[in-house]
Amino acid sequence: MSFPVAFLLVLFLVPFTFATNNLVVRQKELEIVIGGEVSVNFQIKNHTSQSLNATRISLSQSPYISHPDAILVDNWNANVTVLGSQLVSGAILEALNCTTDGSITCPLDLEDAFARITVIRSHFLAILIQIVGWTYFFAWSISFYPQMYLNFKRKSVVGLNFDFLSLNLVGFCAYAIFNLLMYYNSHVKNEYNIVNPRSPPPVLLNDVVFAVHAFLACFITILQCLFYERDNQSVSSKCIALMIVLISFGFCSAAATVLRKIQLLSFVTSLSYIKMAVTCCKYFPQAYFNYTRKSTVGWSIGNIMLDFTGGTLDILQMILQAVNVNDWSAFYANPVKFGLGFVSIFFDIIFMVQHYVLYPNAEVPHNEYHGVDNPNPDNIARDAEQYAGDSESMESTEPIIVHD
C-alpha cells in the first residue's frame, strides 16, 4: 500500500478509533418551570463492549435542581428525572464518573455528557421573551432600508453624514467577520469552549445573518453616495484617522495570530472591540452635522425609529430574562452589551428631538422629499432673471416648507 493511501486511511479512521464509548446528552438546553420536572437522556454511542450496558453513572449536584446521585445504563441509555428547585439561568447537570463491573476506572468518554437546565418562573414570560427577541431582530434588520429608500427617492444623499456611513461600514465589517468565525470556525469554537467550558454558544445563526446583512446594507448605502447628488460632502480627516487606527488594530491582531503570538480567539475578540469603538463614536458626526445645518433633511427618521425600537426591545428582553430566572448578572457581568445598547438609544432620542422639536420645519434644498416637489435651483434663477424686471431683488421665490 502506498504512503498517500495509507495516510488517507489513517486520517479517515482516526476519528472512528477515538470516537468510541462516548456518553452523550443530545438535548443540551432544557427549560422547566420552577417545581416542574424534565427527563434527561444519557446515551452511550459507539460502544465496544456489552459490559458497558451495566454502567453506573455518577451525576453532579446543584442546589437549583434535584435528581438522584447516580443512574444505571439500560440498553445503552440512562434517563434521569430532574426537578426544578430554584430559579436559575443555567444549572449544569453532568456525568462526573462511571463504574462498570466493579471497576474504579470509567471506560466512557464523558466530555459531552452534560446538559444546561434553566429553571424559569413562567412559560408565558419565556414565550414573551422569544417574541420580543424576534421583534427587535426584525426591527434592527429593516432599519437600514428607510435611509436607502429616501436616498433613492431624492436621488440625493445630502444630509447623510459620510463619517457616520464610513464608521458604520468598518464596524459592521468587523462584526460580520467576528460572527462568521465564532459560528463556523471549529478552531475558534474549540478555544472558546476551553476558556468557557459548558457555556452556551455565544453566536447563533440569526446573529450571523444580521451582521452580514447589516454590512451589505451599509455597503449599498455607500454605493448610493457615489451616484447620487452629494453636494460637497466628504469623509473628514478625523474620521479617516480613526478608521486607520481601527483597521490597523485589526491587521495587527491578525498578524499576531499568524505569528502565533496570540490565539485565534483573541483575534476574533479584537474584532468585537472594533465594533464597540465604532458604536461609541459613529453617532457624533451625524448629530453634529444636523446641528450645524439646523436640519435633519436627508437623514431618515424611519431609520432612527426602528433602531430605537430594536434597542429598547433588546434591553426589555434582558429585563424579562432576568425576571424569569431571577438573575440580573447580565447587566453588571456584561456591562458592554448594556452600555452599547444604552448609547444607541441615547443618540436615537437626540435625533428624534432634532427632527421633531428643534428642526421640524426645515427647508428642503433638494428635488424631492416625502413626496413634496421642489423647484430646481437653476430654474429658480432663470425665472427670476426673466421676470424680475426692475425688481432689485430676486427673493420672490419662496422656499418650500416641509411640515411633518
Curated annotation (Swiss-Prot):
Q: How does it sit in the membrane?
A: Multi-pass membrane protein
Q: Which reaction does it catalyse?
A: L-cystine(out) + H(+)(out) = L-cystine(in) + H(+)(in)
| Disulphide-bonded residues | none
Give GO MF terms, alphabetically: L-amino acid efflux transmembrane transporter activity; L-cystine transmembrane transporter activity; symporter activity
Glycosylated position list: N46, N53, N79, N97
Cellular component terms, GO, for this chain's entry?
A: lysosomal membrane; lysosome; phagocytic vesicle
Q: What is this protein called?
A: Cystinosin homolog
Source organism per entry reads Caenorhabditis elegans
Gene name, per UniProt, is ctns-1
